[in-house]
């Protein structure tokens, strides 16, 4: 028997200390990693519920275990809500993460040795889109597309490569690309060469849900995403698809890749999807994009170069070469000033992947805590202050004090 009032702080002080320390970090640091966000208390409550106890292999109404009548309700709510948000014919909410969602698509439609086409990791793509060390690069023949001289996707080159190599799967989507993607152009190319067209909107899903970024669902055979990042849910994945692909995708997830779904996480996804259907969520995403534009413009005014020249989303890459500092060093010194970013390669980066010449900055988390125009401008100036004098301890101390003053005014969890 368990007593409900016995908590982690009583049973495991070491873990409780780590949780409390991380809570303090999140409250007192400005989070600028584009793939991170803050889940709502409602999402976290669902994820910490008794649904974690239930095994439910299969799908609603077709389980391999008894006693699934209540988790069926939770999963069906998640499915119905995410279909409504994105206008999808069908949806699978069971993927444990975005990588699993992408793997399931490949399992459903490809055999080892088939050719796939995705955006080059070195120019903004994601490792699951064909990186040699990833399963996608090990099992399939990979053809990559990249950027043109203006650091925008080179659609003409992509089209030429598609006709030359005739891939079975074409992937659109990126992890470090700030501009809007022309999904309709990709779809036409995929149709012309007879390829399945998959879009990975892991980074852009929240923006798409709110209508501030193009929706690929009308154009794609399959759309994958994570449920955290800009969508602001629990860590997990989803797959949206045309109805004719539902059976193949569902079979690829279970029993193809996964066993029992995480019902507590699926319930948390459902809660996040309901939140994403609210007017407040749309206003939030509008501010995410506005904050990103303000940060990019301010950094440009301070002498930093934004890759692609601008952002049209929530994310940007900053080229640091003119400042004589690497991405690795910038990540460290900004972290010392309590601003969390990640080092990131820029196109044609001369540095090693763990060093890099750039950093990636995103605005979803800072916007969740209430930052608007003024705070976005202040944050960008604080970033620039650090990067102008990265080895000056007094400068770092002064910026850290300003960061604390700002975060104290905008707590994440009140």
UniProtKB/Swiss-Prot annotation:
EC number(s) given by UniProt: 2.1.2.1
Record InterPro entries: PyrdxlP-dep_Trfase, PyrdxlP-dep_Trfase_major, PyrdxlP-dep_Trfase_small, Ser_HO-MeTrfase, Ser_HO-MeTrfase-like, Ser_HO-MeTrfase_PLP_BS, SHMT-like_dom
CDD domains: SHMT
Subcellular location: Cytoplasm
GO CC terms of this entry: cytosol
Keywords: Amino-acid biosynthesis, Cytoplasm, One-carbon metabolism, Pyridoxal phosphate, Transferase
Gene Ontology MF annotations: glycine hydroxymethyltransferase activity; pyridoxal phosphate binding
Family as reported in the entry's similarity comment: Belongs to the SHMT family.
Function statement: Catalyzes the reversible interconversion of serine and glycine with tetrahydrofolate (THF) serving as the one-carbon carrier. This reaction serves as the major source of one-carbon groups required for the biosynthesis of purines, thymidylate, methionine, and other important biomolecules. Also exhibits THF-independent aldolase activity toward beta-hydroxyamino acids, producing glycine and aldehydes, via a retro-aldol mechanism.
Assembly and binders: Homodimer.
Protein name, UniProt field: Serine hydroxymethyltransferase
Organism (species): Variovorax paradoxus (strain S110)
Top-level taxonomy: Bacteria, Pseudomonadati, Pseudomonadota, Betaproteobacteria, Burkholderiales
């Amino acid at each position: 028997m368990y007593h409900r009032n016995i908590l982690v702080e009583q049973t495991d002080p070491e873990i409780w200390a780590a949780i409390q320390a991380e809570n303090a970090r999140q409250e007192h640091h400005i989070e600028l990693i584009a793939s991170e966000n803050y889940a709502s208390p409602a999402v976290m409550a669902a994820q910490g519920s008794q649904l974690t106890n239930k095994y439910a292999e299969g799908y609603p109404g077709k389980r391999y275990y008894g006693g699934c009548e209540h988790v069926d309700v939770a999963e069906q709510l998640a499915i119905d809500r995410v279909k409504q948000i994105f206008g999808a014919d069908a949806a699978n909410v069971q993927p444990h993460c975005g990588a699993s969602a992408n793997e399931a698509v490949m399992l459903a439609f490809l055999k080892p040795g088939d050719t796939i086409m995705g955006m080059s990791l070195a120019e903004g793509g994601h490792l699951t889109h064909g990186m040699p060390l990833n399963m996608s690069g090990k099992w399939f023949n990979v053809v990559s597309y990249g950027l043109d001289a203006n650091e925008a996707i080179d659609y003409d080159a992509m089209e030429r490569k598609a006709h030359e190599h005739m891939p079975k799967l074409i992937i659109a989507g990126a992890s470090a690309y700030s501009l809007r993607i022309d999904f309709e152009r990709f779809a036409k190319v995929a149709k012309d060469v007879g390829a399945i067209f998959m879009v990975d909107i892991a980074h852009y899903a929240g923006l798409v849900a709110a209508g501030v970024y193009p929706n690929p669902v009308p154009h794609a055979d399959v759309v994958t995403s994570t449920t955290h990042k800009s969508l602001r849910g629990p860590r997990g994945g989803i797959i949206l698809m045309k109805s004719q692909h539902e059976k193949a995708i569902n079979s690829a997830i279970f029993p193809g890749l996964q066993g029992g779904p995480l019902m507590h996480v699926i319930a948390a996804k459902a809660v996040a999807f309901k939140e994403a259907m609210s007017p407040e969520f749309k206003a939030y995403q509008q501010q995410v994009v506005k904050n990103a534009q303000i940060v990019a413009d301010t950094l440009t005014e301070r002498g930093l170069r934004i890759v692609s020249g601008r952002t049209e989303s929530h994310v940007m890459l900053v080229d640091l070469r003119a400042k004589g500092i690497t991405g690795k060093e910038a990540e460290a010194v900004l972290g010392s000033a309590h601003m969390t970013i990640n080092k990131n390669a820029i196109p044609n980066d001369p540095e090693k992947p763990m060093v890099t010449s750039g950093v990636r900055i995103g605005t979803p988390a800072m916007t969740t805590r209430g930052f608007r125009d003024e705070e976005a401008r202040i944050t960008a100036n604080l970033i620039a202050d650090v990067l102008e004098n990265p080895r000056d301890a007094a400068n770092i101390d002064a910026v850290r004090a300003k960061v604390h003053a700002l975060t104290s005014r905008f707590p994440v969890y009140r």
